[in-house]
């Protein structure tokens, strides 16, 4: 009888030990949540700025602060840089792109930049580059340089950045992306297939000459820390290109950095 009691007691102790060890392991698991996939991390990094889209009034950026780091001097409120361009293959076998960059200084609450027209040739010829200074007041683009071409002048004065009409709050709807990483830079890229039914795609087709029914690819690129850095940058590209020798895309970026003395040096 005494032997049987010892056996029962031994079994109880063993069961309790297994139960306690199991609880400890489950506790460790709960304390160490599973790290997000690189695709999810790239999306989260972009969400910090894309959640602000559409920015219908660009002057709202004066009251919004981005991620700060040690590159910012004391008292510097920082500067937003917003950029959009449309690039396409040209008849000369090169590339033409046209767009605008605007620097919004939160310290002075002023916005200056330029509209650019660039033509790159396949070979044996230097590219053509033209810049036209602009500023923004009351959410309106004001052309500062003289432009002879009335069509170009109209395009500049009526220009809208992709971030002013895009809505990319539901990045989670883009799944199974093709992710590539270069740890040496570091840089991160993710590609997602888009649908022609996407409202962002419809907006681009209504604003630009896109002579293809091919559904585009959304490309997300990050240089620098995934959590954000004033040294690195992020950009989006909506690529309508038909093949390797065909370029047709819209590039967009919105980055927060320390304010510069002269934005035109960019």
UniProtKB/Swiss-Prot annotation:
Its main location: membrane. GO terms for cellular component: plasma membrane. It comes from the Bacteria. A lipid is attached at residue 23 (S-diacylglycerol cysteine). It is a lipid-anchor. It is found in: Cell membrane. Keywords: Cell membrane, Lipoprotein, Membrane, Palmitate, Signal. A lipid is attached at residue 23 (N-palmitoyl cysteine). Residues 1-22 form the signal peptide. Belongs to the staphylococcal tandem lipoprotein family. NCBIfam families: SA_tandem_lipo. This is Uncharacterized lipoprotein SAR0443. It comes from Staphylococcus aureus (strain MRSA252).
